[in-house]
Amino acid sequence: MGVLDRQVSDTQIKLRSRLWLYIFSVVVLFLLIVPSMIVIPMSFSDSQYLEFPPKDWSFRWYENYFFSWKVENGFNDWMAATRTSLLVAVLTIFVATPIGTLAAYGLANSTSRLRAVLFPIMISPMMVPIILVAIGLFYFYVQFKMVNSIIGLVLGHSLVAMPLVLIIVMSALKNYDMNQEKVARSLGASRPRAFVEITLPQIKFSLISFLTSFDEIIISLFVSGGANSTITRSMFLALRDQIDPTIAAISTILIITSSGLLIVSQMLGSKSQ
């Protein structure tokens, strides 16, 4: 029996029957990953322009990023933009995560007919084109003078991150036995305490909103600027107004950081299970 004729599962499906699916998956992964990976060697180029493949290798653009605070022109202060993005992303965690988690918990335990109505409303920011959300936020913030403010950025990013948290937590709760919480309550624990000590630890690794906020660009373009410009907004403007290879260095750092956080999250999630 050849390798392609071996059974893939107990349903008698053979590897040959799925070969086309594996090939298609490899092609899709290639098209998704390779364009992102090209930016990595470009970040080590010594050229003044984005160049692939690099003719000469250098760390000059990483140095330009980490020491950009020494540049008098605020447009090139990448570190200030990075600090703003980190601050907004952390604050978004404390806004979007509790709201999304409690909403998911309430919907998962609800037997009301309103559940079918509330869920689409809560995930509507994901369904509506993000450009429309950004325009709406801009005109709303103008009325309250919240444009270019940290609070405005946090609320805007939370609006986008909350539906993602809601969906992920609801998915995690489907695999969670709610009887564990009922047992805790029968032993004298209050409902909030049972949720915090029994339910929350088993779904905590499904709570992600940091990366959603850190990578967000559309809302940032409309409601941030000046001293409160985010790193993604600064990258977009630099790519539009000038060819700065520092963007490739920052992109490489973001790719490595995001991938590392996702891997750690998956490892911790698997370990907790």
Which residues does each PLM region occupy?
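Interhelical loop and adjacent transmembrane-helix boundary motif
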Residues: I13-R18, S47, F59-N73, F214-V264
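Faces of alpha-helical transmembrane segments in polytopic inner-membrane proteins
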Residues: L31, T92, I99, M122-L132, ...
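C-terminal transmembrane helix and the adjacent membrane-cytosol boundary/short C-terminal tail
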Residues: M1-D10, W20-I23, M170-R185, R191-P192, ...
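Membrane-interfacial helix termini and adjacent extracytoplasmic/periplasmic loops
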Residues: L50, P54, F59, L114-A116, ...
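Membrane-embedded alpha-helices of multi-pass transport/permease systems
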Residues: V34-M37, P41, P98-L102, L118, ...
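A structural signal for multi-pass alpha-helical bundles of membrane permease subunits
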Residues: V34-S47, T84, A134-F144, L153, ...
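N-terminal, non-cleaved signal-anchor transmembrane helix
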Residues: M1-R83, V264-Q273
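Transmembrane-helix boundary motif in ABC transporter permease subunits
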Residues: V3-K14, A89-M122, I135, Y139, ...
